[in-house]
């Protein structure tokens, strides 16, 4: 396998890693036709306006939350243990409703006609500042009696957790049975989070999981296309007995959990209605309407649901709800990237440093693939040793391409060289490269994780470009060990490609570049050893197999 094919292999792998989602976007989900009636009922609910908020601040060891006292919306959520992408001196803000972007969590109670019974009513709280005391802190917002119903909205925050419980306490004094449903939604705009780039772009938008439809992304662009086609509101609607839904972005997520692991679904009184749409105000909403059991006059009831708003930490989210780890965006290679990250995580648990864990993982992957890559590199080494003879054939036959090809094929037969012998093993490595790319790129566990010296965050680009420069040097070394091309254009490509790849990797997370550098160093050692072995055999007059 010559350098041209090797370069093509890396180029194809890189294009697939970066552009797979763009080349093969997730198919747009189609609403079930029998749910048209439910669609009208769900969309009839008034969309809560994002009016100026009267803030209630809640501080725990993991988050600082701002709740609007009037609407009861969760308007701002700061993750105190994570630094902002653009400014490491500030904490990371997940929810917000400022000038920069809109991203909030809302909840309402709806009547049988889908009307928000709390619209225009307003809550009140006994104080404006709450902090963690013990393991939990509870914020109770009380609304004036409406329709004979006394309603409180209660937020419960837990120490060491990114789970927020949202509960409605309802007392029915209306003189009649109350038939209600609780509507929970996450609303955001289309703004890109900080850190998004062409080489480091990840999915941002709605996601949903149900047993019937499995995991699906419902992209902003799909919702926009529906809106442009003439619909007043583009929607994705489904009925489900369980599941979860919300919004994801690189490393972080916010999801309503319909059935916590090992517990009863909130949809026990009837199937929940999921609704994902672009609203009339051009904000995007993922919501679920949860039917409540009929509340008799004089009775009390509650509607409770968990909101997970935090990092996509695999070990955490896997224990919150079934298949919640699917929200960790490994693109279309989840089946392969997930076990690779599992192995990387096990190594980290032993070593204690993500950078060294990446190095050990690279060595393990290289060892597993050794039987395949060894055949490829032996083929390249034999081609390298036969390069003078190939050059002589080219000079002898000049422009007679037919005679030149026949002479080369005879040389391959005499030297026991299969010019394509190394292609298949190299192609089989493509899934490994792609899987590792996504495993490293998508994992919040590597965010702000140091390696050594100047590498203080493996999820961000090398600030001094040292690793990309080392990578370029290793690629130049590989070109020296590869068969020298007889074509002048290929020779130029050999000199240019290391520089091109190095510049591209300036923008890649340091963890990815570290993997590539170590892999290149191991490849150089393997190729050098094989070259020496074949040259020694040729010098001794042995037949090289």
Swiss-Prot record:
It holds the Pfam family 60KD_IMP. It comes from the Bacteria. GO terms for biological process: protein insertion into membrane; protein transport. The keyword Ion transport does not apply. GO terms for molecular function: membrane insertase activity. One of its GO terms (cellular component) is plasma membrane. Its main location: membrane. Belongs to the OXA1/ALB3/YidC family. Type 1 subfamily. Interacts with the Sec translocase complex via SecD. Specifically interacts with transmembrane segments of nascent integral membrane proteins during membrane integration. This is Membrane protein insertase YidC. It comes from Neisseria meningitidis serogroup B (strain ATCC BAA-335 / MC58). The lineage of its organism: Bacteria, Pseudomonadati, Pseudomonadota, Betaproteobacteria, Neisseriales.
């Amino acid at each position: 396998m010559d350098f041209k094919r090797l370069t093509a292999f890396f180029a194809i792998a890189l294009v697939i890693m970066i552009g797979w989602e763009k080349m093969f976007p997730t198919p747009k989900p189609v609403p079930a036709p029998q749910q048209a009636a439910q669609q009208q009922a769900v969309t009839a609910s008034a969309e809560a306006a994002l009016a100026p908020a009267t803030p209630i601040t809640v501080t725990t060891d993991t988050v600082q939350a701002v709740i609007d006292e009037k609407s009861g919306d969760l308007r701002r959520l700061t993750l105190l243990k994570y630094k902002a992408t653009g400014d490491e001196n500030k904490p990371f803000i997940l929810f917000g409703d400022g000038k920069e972007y809109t991203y909030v969590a809302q909840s309402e109670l709806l009547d049988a006609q889908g009307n928000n019974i709390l619209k225009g009513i307003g809550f009140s709280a006994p104080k404006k500042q709450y902090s963690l005391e013990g393991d939990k802190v509870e914020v109770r917002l009380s609304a004036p009696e409406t329709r004979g119903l006394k309603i409180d909205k209660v937020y419960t925050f837990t120490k060491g957790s990114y789970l927020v419980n949202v509960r409605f306490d309802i007392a029915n004094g209306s003189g009649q049975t109350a038939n209600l449903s609780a509507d929970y939604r996450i609303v955001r705009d289309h703004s890109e989070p900080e850190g998004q780039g062409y080489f480091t772009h990840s999915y941002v938008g709605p996601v949903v999981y149900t047993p019937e439809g499995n995991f699906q992304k419902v992209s902003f662009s799909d919702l926009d296309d529906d809106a442009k086609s003439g619909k007043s509101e583009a929607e994705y609607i489904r009925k489900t007995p369980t599941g979860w839904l919300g919004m994801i972005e690189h490393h972080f997520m916010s999801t309503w959990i319909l059935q916590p692991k090992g517990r009863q679904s909130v949809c026990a009184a009837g199937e929940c209605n999921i609704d994902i749409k672009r609203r009339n105000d051009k904000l995007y909403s993922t919501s679920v309407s949860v039917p409540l059991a009929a509340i008799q006059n004089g009775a009390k009831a509650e509607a409770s649901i968990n909101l997970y708003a935090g990092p996509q930490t695999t070990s955490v989210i896997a224990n919150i709800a079934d298949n919640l780890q699917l929200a960790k965006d490994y693109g279309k290679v989840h089946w392969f990237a997930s076990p690779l990250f599992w192995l990387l995580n096990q190594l980290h648990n032993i070593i204690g440093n993500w950078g060294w864990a990446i190095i050990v993982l690279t060595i393990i992957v290289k060892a597993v693939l050794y039987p395949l890559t060894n055949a490829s590199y032996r083929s390249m080494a034999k081609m390298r040793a036969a390069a003078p003879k190939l050059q002589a054939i080219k000079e002898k036959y000049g422009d007679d391409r037919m005679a030149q090809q026949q002479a080369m094929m005879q040389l391959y037969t005499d030297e026991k060289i299969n010019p394509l012998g190394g292609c298949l093993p190299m192609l089989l490595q493509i899934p490994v490269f792609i899987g590792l790319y996504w495993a490293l790129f998508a994992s919040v566990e590597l965010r702000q994780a140091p390696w050594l010296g100047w590498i203080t965050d493996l999820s961000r680009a090398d600030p001094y470009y040292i690793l990309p420069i080392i990578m370029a040097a290793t690629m130049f070394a590989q070109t020296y060990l590869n068969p020298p091309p007889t074509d002048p254009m290929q020779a130029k490509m050999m000199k240019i490609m290391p520089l091109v790849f190095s510049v591209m990797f300036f923008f890649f997370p340091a963890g990815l570049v570290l993997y590539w550098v170590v892999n290149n160093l191991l490849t150089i050692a393997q190729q050098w050893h094989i070259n020496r072995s074949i040259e020694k055999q040729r010098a001794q007059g042995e037949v090289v197999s």
